[in-house]
Amino acid sequence: MVVNIGLYAFKVTCEQQLTSTIDSIYGDASAPDNPADFEVKVVSPSFLRRFIRPQMSFYCDQHSPFKPLPASQAYAILEWGMNWCIATHDHTRLLVHAAVLVKNDQAIIFPALPGSGKSTLTAYMALSGWSLYSDEMAIIDLKSGLVSPLYRPVCLKNDSIDLVKKWFPDSVFTSTWKDTHKGDVAHLKASSWSRYTQYTPTEIVAVIFPKYILNSDLNIYSLNQLQAFETLSKNAFNYGVLGRLGFNVVNKIIKRAALFEIEFGDLRDVEAFLSEDIIK
């Protein structure tokens, strides 16, 4: 089967039981216009591992970048493997580990470390009317500095899974994969293909580094350009490979974007700040 995520397409070989989960997330996407960019497999690493403590491995062109995982985590390893393919092979764009949300044709990127609450924030905003361009990766044009959308789900972990289900009971989730190296994981379908096709490359108006703190008020800290440059470039998968091209596009972004770090305990406070103070 072919998985179309917009900018990239994956030809996926996998066990039959995995295809239903893939269809629940990507089944409404149209067939890509061009051949697949990547050929990947999620299969058992050996015949015995199909039956004794079943495991699955991810392969891209016969290369397996991860250790085998329990077969119950097959969909999770597919999503992580797709991220790996893009981050490792596409050096025609700047790729930043960040969420991207858009409103009124204005993009905000949220680079963040694990545990920052980035994906919970992304899910909440995407299901509250914002356009989801990405949960995991900002795809930025090297010349224009515009950020492009990907058709991907939101990866939620641990307590945030039940929180989002409580806030949005009609939302579409995969099963929850227990005890992965990231904890309990589930993927949320936060958009539709028909909506995705309306998205276009968009200017980045703000770079915001979020950090969730239980019961915290919203604390907002302005960053200077040097601070933002250092942190944004460190969050880029291929900044070092791009050399001067990477430097130039990061420099372009921080010169024209609002730059903040925020601490938050209530997502409604974040939404109010973004809608009232960032988006025009």
Question: Where do the protein language model's features map onto the residues?
Answer:
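Glycine-rich, often acidic-flanked micro-motifs
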Residues: 4-24, 33-37, 87, 99, ...
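Post-Walker A alpha-helix
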Residues: 121-122
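Conserved lysine of the Walker
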Residues: 118
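An anion/pyrophosphate-binding glycine-rich loop and adjacent beta-alpha core
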Residues: 1, 27
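Charged, amphipathic alpha-helical linker segments immediately N-terminal to NTP-binding catalytic cores
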Residues: 41-85, 264, 277
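Short coil-to-beta microelement around the adenine-binding A-loop and adjacent beta1/P-loop entry
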Residues: 92-93
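Active-site phosphate-binding and catalytic loops of NTP-dependent enzymes
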Residues: 29-31
